[in-house]
Amino acid sequence: MAKKSRAPKKSQKAQKQQKNRVDDTESTPVQGAAAGVYPISTGEAELVPDGYHADGWLLLINGVQSSHVIVGEPRQLDFEYMRWIAAVVSSHVEEHLDAAKLRITHLGGGACSMARYFADLYPTSRNTVVELDAKLAEYVRAWFDIPKAPRVKIRVGEAGAVTATFAPASRDVLIRDVFAGDTTPEALTTVEFTRTVAESLAPGGLYILNCGDGPALTGARAEASALLEVFEYVCIVADSAMLKGRRRGN
């Protein structure tokens, strides 16, 4: 591959991708969303128009769908599992928490879709997003209408290590939506990690996690078992086809 020869003619698709690729040496990301492939700390991020909304964008991380955002419409959640999270959290807040003083932590940032949603739904809430990829965090701030800190604060770090630093009873809601590819890192699914999460929750607090799994539900069963070791009340939300083992889902 080191042999120097005439470069083959690139296809139109390859030329387009190369044109849209952002040089890693740029010190400042583009302002506003622009379709293209962008180098990030953990690989590549691709930003694609969703084809349905004028300002709708789909974010892919290393080829896997990560987030969907409609600029100017933070309460529009396109991913079904995010709508489930929103419904569960809002119901729990109404029954058990003070909506005026919410402290919400998001493990896994992506495009900060859920943080944007809750910052808009609860204007006085404080949302902390823990994102592993520093470059991605920089990009999404430039691309999308994410409220500034303290409404939405992005903290760069590994989710497990950062969670271990949380003071006891310092969070009202903790949302785990962390993936490496299409799988949650094992270290974030253990009983030990779950105990760390529980210790960080204030009385009446809620831990809600996104579990991607196949038809056998092996991962979901293991996660439920770990949760039941720590929490008194555990609930699983999914569509019936997934619970019946007919397809992969969240």
PLM features: residue spans?
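Substrate-binding/catalytic lobe of Class I Rossmann-like enzymes that use SAM or dcSAM, i.e.
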Residues: G212-G214, T218-N250
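Rossmann-like AdoMet
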Residues: M1-E95, Y117-L121
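The AdoMet/dcAdoMet-binding core of the Class I SAM-like
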Residues: Y38, H53, G72-P203, P215-T218, ...
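Short, histidine-centered active-site or binding-site loop motifs used for metal coordination
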Residues: G63-Q65, V178-A180, C211-D213
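Conserved beta-strand signature within the Rossmann-like core of class I S-adenosyl-L-methionine
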Residues: G204-C211
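Short, structured loop/turn "capping" segments at alpha-beta junctions
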Residues: P150, Y207, V234-C235
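Short, solvent-exposed coil/turn elements at secondary-structure transition points
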Residues: V64, G160, S240-M242
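A generic fold-level signal
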Residues: T42, A99, R246-R248
